[in-house]
Amino acid sequence: MSVQAYTNTPNLPNLIHSESITNSPVFIPNLRSKSDNKHRLNTSEELPFTKKRRATKHFLKMEVSAKISEPPSSKSVEFGRHLNMRHDFSELLEQPLTTSKTRVFKSFNEKLKGKPQLVKSDKGVLPLNKQSDILNSYERVLSNASVDSALDKKAEVDIIPFDKSVMEPKNITFNDKSGLTKFGNSNSYETTYSDSSNYHTSTDSSQYNDQDDHVYDDTNDGTDDDINNNEYKDDESSSGSESYERDEDVDEEEEEDDDENNDEGDDEDENENDELRSENGSPNPSAAVINEQENMNMSGIEEYDETNLLNELGRIRRGNQFQSLASSILSSGNLENSDDEDVSLGPQTYRFNSSFHPFRSAFSAPGVQFGRLLEGIKDFSDPTVQMLSLQELSEAFAMSTEDMLVGLFSTDSYIAAFSEILSGRNYDFGEVSIQLMLSCTTCVSNMMEALPLCMAKIAYSPIVRILCERMFDMQYIDIAEQALGVLERLSKDFGICILEHRGMLAALQYFDFFYTTVQRTAISLAANCCKFLDESNASAAEEIIPLLSNILQSSDTIVVSKAYSCLETIIESLKTSPNIIETIISEDLITTIVNALTNSTSQNKSMHLQVQLLHIISSLCQSSSALILPFLNHNLPDVMYEMLCGIPPSDTSHQADMITMQSLYYCPIELIENLLRAITSLLPKNTSNLSDEFNTKLYRLNSILLTVVMDIYFIVPLHDIRSLAVTTALKMLCSIRENNLDGLVCSLPLSSFIASILNSRKSDNFLKRDALEMCLFLLEALPNVYSSLFIREGVVQEVGFLVRSTNADMKKIKLSISFSQNKSAARHEELKNLSTLKSLAKEFLSNYKEENLENSTLVQLKQLSKHLLSETKQDESFSELAKIFQEGSNITSHELLHSGLIHNLLLSLKKFGSSSLRTFLLAMNTCDEREVLEFGNGPLVSLIFCLQNLLSTVENFQLSTLPPDTENAVDHVFSRQFKLRLMALPGSRIRPPFRSLVVSINGLATIRTLDNYLHSRISVRNETGRRFSILREAGSLRESMSGSSRNSSGDYTDSMSQDAPNHTTEPSERRDSSTSSHFEEHFVFSLMGKKVPRNKTIFRILYEYIQLSDDHTLDDFWKTPVPIFYGEPDCIHNDMKGELNYENETEGFSINIREILDLLSILYYGIRDVHTLFPDKHFRGNIENILTDFSNWKLSAKLNRQLEEQQLVVHGCLPSWCISLTSAYPFLVPFETRYLLLQSTAFGLSRSVSFLLSRNPELSKNESSSILQFVSLHRQKIRISRKKIFNYALHLLATYAASENILEIEYEDEVGSGLGPTLEFYTSVSKEFTLNSLDIWRNDQPNSKFVYQASGLFPSPIPLLGSSPENERKISLFFALGQFVARSIYDSRIISIQFNPLFFARNIPLTISSVAKVDKGLANSLRYLEKLIPGKNPTNAETDIKLEDLHLDFTLPGFPSIELIPDGASTPVTTFNVSDYLNYVIDYTVGKGVQQQLEAFQNGFSSVFPYTSLQVLTEHELVTLFGTVDEDWSYATLMKSIVADHGYTMESPTIQRLLTLMSQMNFQEQRDFLQFITGSRKLPIGGFAGLNPPLTVVRRLNEPPYVPDDYLPSVMTCVNYLKLPEYSSSEVLGSRLSKAILEGQGSFHLS
């Protein structure tokens, strides 16, 4: 191995790439001449070092390149290129030289595999059995050199793997070819080797003749290196290292200071060095005889001379092994001193400023002078010399930095030479000339990298023109590719130079011939050059537009994105020149843009591309109105509609349009904003001279998008976008031709839209101004329509109120200005805006007179509403109301709200109960047949529609968002730490160090976590002497203290974070109470004088604090601490009893809104239960279609938009209306949205975060994401026995029901585990709960094993008279059932229990109708008995049937053991007590007889998570969720949902046979198949499409001699995997699958 140690010598070329430069302090040796032996360098005063170090450690910087050679033998005397290694000496930047020796030789020893080593140096052959010998050898070289020679010295050391069998002891010569001063006239060493591992060396002579005495002082080595009288001494009895005679003038105190300033890395290296010394013993340097006749032949080591040095370093660089030299050169850069101080180094003085660099003089060394290289480059007579010079110069540039090269040479002559070579004028094109051009281009590229300042000279030199010509010629693609790289670098700052030589065209004309990476370079060059376009060079853009059109068809998304960036930049640069834009933009390009936008919508491509395309369209249309029509001709409005709504536009009913509006909330805000701007750009400024074709297209645009723009106003909460929507709507109206206006706007709720803007509290003056301008336009265009409509919609009344409020505001501002000395321009501007608004309002009101404000419809509705409260006039009033709301009714929201109709109708329906509802529904019946009910397209639907419009108009539910200045990235918000200043409450007994404590805590942590943290830090003694327990929850908190140091304000600062907090919203309170026994007392916390709940997260507390205070934003708490007081509970004052709570249950629920919602609720449940209200009538039509009309699309969109604020959802910061509205009126919002709300909010923090990650997979991909540490969901594996599965299930529920872990089930003696066995467990236990033997359900088939009830499972009543163990058993089973059902939702498991909807009803009315929902036969009997009550039914008064003949007693029908009253079995039912009998039966059936069971179920459910969370779902939806099966097994659905893989495709015959077989299965076969495949007997929500992972069918291979028909299919239930052999026929497939299902049930084994 050849080791070359390069010092900071002028002879060494500085060949370092600029990217490897780092800022580090440097090392300078203690170089002292003999005449200045006692003077040291004062580094602390004269050099800008980062640490105070001795000068002996700050200048010497070495790089070792090692080449391992094999030992010489008779067969191979010289080999040496097996391994090139360069050790990284960058650690020398921070440690003294000798400390780093151990690291160097560790690497050497690993390569040499521990063989005995010899060192061949300038002193001869030495045994290397000590780690530091090699460095000591060249230390001695430096120690005997003068200052000048030390700076110019290249020391060479050879390490020879020693093999005793082939290597004879002999004298080895060393020829010092460095051209430096010789060290002594003769140096003879006699070396002997023994068989032992230790080498013994005797010294014959060690006399050195040198005039200068230099001492290398290593203060960190811990040993003394002595050189006395220039004599080398071998002292075997020394303490383990060579010793030099120390200078007697060395200051001991200075050495101590030096040691104290060493960093930890030095100590580590010293320890490491000490360990190696102890292993190897003390160094035993040997002597060698220097014989100048034999030079290095024995070791086979290649010598380095100055001519091949650059090439060798280049090879090392290409091996990526030059970082240490880079660090070395960088460290030299730190020697610059802004004050240009002189530093004394012995007898010479060096100036450490920008003009000095320790390596710069290397370039003037013999053999590598830049002048010589320039001469070689200009030598056109010898291409070889040119090639070598270019390569050498290129390597020099590649390994250099700007600091190393500045000032060494002039770049002008080199640029001229490069231009001459690239021009090719001096030689014919051939292989040599091509290689010269390639090398020259590489040299130019490296030169720009090393010297960025030369780029300007290159840009304005002939090089750019020549390179562009080379790309135009395209004779040699290699030259073109390199030219592209050079020009791309130049294009960022000097694109104008490339444009002058048509560089963009040159880069793109042969685009298809390049590789993808080169294509990206070419398009990047064009994109950069486009930024320099203007009218003067617009021809360059015109040249490349056709090429860009082709490039836009590329399959590389990066290339396409860059191409659109080119186009976007071109348009922006030339947008003030519409003539040029119209010239360069072709019809084909417009087609390409629209098609790209269409494809991006249908293929769900990146939103960035969509925004980019929309911006291009906006810029083009704004620049030239002539381009609008071509875009409209390509159906751009249809594409925009699909981008907003998710589906293409249709010309169907307005109801269908409203349903599509629900998709608006899926559209990102950024995309909505750009779509609005694009729509605005498509509206021409001057519409007076438009052609008929243009007007037709504009009409199509407005008819499709105007209603969407109006809906955006209601859906998007951001004010800027709402304002943009109103402005866009106004411009759209103004663009419509008057003769077309009537047909368009009459079908749109424009008047109510305007009324909403004027009535909104959130509307500013600019929004109201646009609304007034819209009013004036409509009045002028369609006075006959809107003059009366504005009265009926209440617009006139709102404008009148606006005038009065504006007058009051103007008076306040004028008064403020008159009393204020500061005449604020803003106040004057505000006054001006109000004046404008007032003028528009007065202009509008001038069209109306007081006597013309009468509203006949409103008067009629007021009279009708008065009659609704009279029971005698109900029939007449309801009939008249039905006539008013007949199809086509035009009652406005304003009329409906102010007539009192809603209020009186609601009172009437509530006051007279179900009889009034029956009368109302009969009046709304549109069918003339007596026994038939029909409501479709009748007055009832019209009433519902009017109520929904009114609700959308008057509702004012506000959306919560993060503050605009808050970074809204999900992971960013979760990863940030909040600062809290915890201050002790007055009177607290907390010790002084903790009375003011600043902590940094994640927002996901709770106050309970903070409490536990403080208990672990603070010990407080209360009045009785009890101490707070010092608890540490393992893994719950990780404290990273900053030394518990005080800050400037005297506070202690801690940092807190959670590893795995176990927190949920409601369950946490139960766990908190269960663990509170461990605490003697909890701390209490207060903010703003209010107690802070322990279960709330820090983020939620601070967010509520922001809502209550207008002086702070969320970002403030990331910068400055928020004060929170804490202390013992007895420190809380009487005025601090209330809790900090921003929730307002009545927020947004005005009296009008509440009445509208209540009326809708009565109508909804009345229609849903119409069969119960009218058991003797037949309903015609689909009830579900009417029930969907109760869904309010605006509120649905609002809630979905709110749920997109995932940070607020996770922290429980949703507005209160989200839960209260969906709980009280679930019919307003679709099931999918409410179920999403349930999953996001009901299961606690950990589940909420986990659900967030499932919806945002990109967050969980990064394992270092801080959000992952808060997902403490572990899997609890439980092994049970199948034989007693129900008993095991009950025990499991009693033990683990409230566990936050995910429960997974395994079975004894079975290998299966995971999802499959777990799902089967839930399916099996579901079935066990329906066993007839449990006797807990009503049952229509008492002799069957399992309960069957046609109407669904409902509890059988239990006796109320007395208590018994049997009752307790049943109640406990319902408690366990509640736990089981809750656990299935909590862990997202599928169960199959067919409940009765009444089981989940919130309030069960004690009526025969309720009994009918449970037992129709019993309800019919009760109705019959009801007719026998005297006076109840006059038509049957004279019947011959007597109750006494029925022989009824006071026992519950169907349950003779249950007595309704004491001694009820012997008490007959008579006409006198039949009414009591009916009441008792109803109460026992659906009332008190089942109350305890239902309460037990709810309590068991709440032990997992709150049962009240289910209120967002209706009872029918819960029945569907837990048991009702309504699945789509059609062939088409299966084709869309099933995945074929690993040997199959969807076209494979076996797959086709399987799908056909599945689509033909009956109900029982479907259940068995699902349980075989998934472990569950029913599909999840969404059917087959809801399976996750999807059902996948793969091919099962056969092993000869067996054939596929010999195998049964097998499954992997955990991943829904079906391994299906390729059966020969459908019959074989069906039989084999049936057999597998039959034999595979009830076990999980390996297939």
Swiss-Prot record:
Top-tier EC class: transferase
InterPro entries given in the database record: ARM-like, ARM-type_fold, HECT_dom, Hect_E3_ubiquitin_ligase, HECTD1/TRIP12-like
SUPFAM superfamilies, sorted: ARM repeat, Hect, E3 ligase catalytic domain
GO biological process: proteasome-mediated ubiquitin-dependent protein catabolic process; protein polyubiquitination
EC number(s) stated in the UniProt entry for this protein: 2.3.2.26
UniProtKB keywords: Transferase, Ubl conjugation pathway
UniProt biased composition (Basic and acidic residues): 1066-1076
Residue ranges with Polar residues bias: 192-209, 1051-1065
Bias type Low complexity, positions: 1039-1050
Cellular component, GO annotation: cytosol; mitochondrial outer membrane; nuclear speck; nucleus
Catalytic activity: S-ubiquitinyl-[E2 ubiquitin-conjugating enzyme]-L-cysteine + [acceptor protein]-L-lysine = [E2 ubiquitin-conjugating enzyme]-L-cysteine + N(6)-ubiquitinyl-[acceptor protein]-L-lysine
Residue ranges occupied by any HECT domain in the UniProt entry: 1294-1647
Region (K-box): 1183-1257
UniProt signal peptide: none
Region (Disordered), start-end ranges: 192-288, 1039-1076
Positions annotated as active site in the UniProt record: C1614
Ranges of compositional bias, category Acidic residues: 218-228, 245-273
Gene3D superfamilies membership: Hect, E3 ligase catalytic domain (3.30.2410.10), Hect, E3 ligase catalytic domains (3.90.1750.10), Leucine-rich Repeat Variant (1.25.10.10)
Note: A cysteine residue is required for ubiquitin-thioester formation.
Recorded family membership: Belongs to the UPL family. K-HECT subfamily.
Function, as annotated: E3 ubiquitin-protein ligase which accepts ubiquitin from an E2 ubiquitin-conjugating enzyme in the form of a thioester and then directly transfers the ubiquitin to targeted substrates.
Record's protein name: Probable ubiquitin fusion degradation protein C12B10.01c
